[in-house]
Amino acid sequence: MHYVSVEGLTKSYGITPLFKGISFNINEGDRIALIARNGVGKSTLLRILSGKEQPEAGTCKIHKDVHLVMFEQEPQFIENATVTQNLFNQEHPTMKAISNYEMAMESEDEDLITNSIMEMEENNAWDFESKVKTILTQLNIHHLEQPVSKLSGGQRKRVSLAKTLIQIGFEPKHVLLLMDEPTNHLDLNMIEWLENYLEQEKVTLLLVSHDRYFLEAVTDEIWELEREKLYSYKGDYENYLEKKAARIESELASIDKAKNTFRKELEWMRKQPKARTTKSKSRQDNFYEVEAKAKQKIDDTNLQLEMKMTRLGGKIIEAKKVYKSYGDLVVLKGFDYTFSKGERIGIVGKNGVGKSTFLQILQGITQPDSGKINVGETIVFGHFSQEGLVYKKDMRVIEYLKTFAEQFPLASGGSLSAAQFLELFLFTPDKQYTYLSALSGGEKKRLQLLTILFKNPNFLILDEPTNDLDLPTLAVLEQFLLDYAGCVLLVSHDRYFMDKLVDHLFIFEGDGVIRDYPGNYTQFRILEKSKQSYASVSSDISTSKESATVVEKIVP
């Protein structure tokens, strides 16, 4: 069954074409990842499919029996309404019953609770209410009577995600789910739960995400928007990389062939008289096609860049018996650690356990309650925070980067200009003269990252650097960090990114306890799951023994 049929879709942003004449079908059961650089039309394509934007040309047909549900990066709410009212603003009796029940339980009014229970029973809503409870619990959504306007950015995203999941669980059989970066603002446990949830829900899915493990878990086909075209690849992310590399190799060979032909045809064109025969006119038309092919550029995001890092001395950072609390929240309880040269440490823990506070304490931004943080004299921190790009006045991208430095020194003794450095990180010459206010969220994140790297730090502290970055930018950043000789302290919900870059983990277990685990995130999760399985089996054996003992006592 075709859920969606698209023919000849074209859309531009101002004078910039996003995609031109693309066609595709989405069929029942498809699970598709849509990837591309920021600013080339991923979110726009989703909005066209949902009917929130119109194409300039082409058709988009949704099957009449298909119910479309969309999760957007910028959630829309009734701001003065409560979380409950926003979650359940549906007209169906079952949704109303659940909404009334949740509000009654929050109010603790016995009459309201009794009436809401009767309404739940009349509408057979208990099974669905149980599913709703699971969604809210797993996404850490509490205080349902709080106005949405009081929520933080991360809380808003989680409420929006919960609303989306409630909708797909409630809607009839044929559901098409469109999701735009659903893992942003989720911790690692939430992401793993969401993977399992989407696998269980038999929905047809079109997903935009930079989280490669998430893509591999919930999709089986990758579409890429590139140079105004849409390319499709069956299989997982690794297969996509292989197939794309083969395609680019073929395209480069084709361009080289066109360049050779172009040189010959250019010589012929110069020798031709102005009056053309029909045959020469045809050859002339073909010349312009060959010229366009020969001048085509294929982007290569492979980065080889050895920075001239600020020298690291023998002493890095020493933490001695560090304590920090905020009221009842204990962030650090006697933390001791001596950092070594070239260490790459990943930080793992639930939202709200104090990971960002820990990073601030190491840099001296926040003071501990007791204990000492001794930082080596040669340490130059480069801190990527979640606060985003900070600028006092609007200016062009290249002007902004030059306020930090004019040149980027290389280990070879040379240097890169600000323009060259920007281009390495996928800011084209045209984009370099764009005003900061006109950049997308992902482009601002990328520029924020560049300003930190441009300062030549020898100790990088990266707090969720992958949020809002596209996959091509992530590939460039990963390669840069793999070649980086300094220390790296990384907080990220991107497990692929973490696995590729870190040597060991600081596990924030809560109540101020930090455990040092010698391995990457995937290895840690495998160990944790094996412990849980062992504990479960041991519990079952213990229960069986107790039951057997009881039977022996009862049976004469």
Q: Language-model segments: which ranges?
A:
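Intracellular alpha-helical coupling/juxtamembrane segments of multi-pass membrane proteins
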Residues: K243-R276, S280-Q284, V290-K297
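A short, surface-exposed helix-loop junction/capping segment
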Residues: D109-E119, R263-K271, D300
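ABC ATP-binding cassette signature C-motif
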Residues: M1-I255, L305-P556
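Proline-centered turn/helix-capping motifs that create local helix->coil transitions or kinks
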Residues: T277-K279, E289-D299, K393, Q532-D540
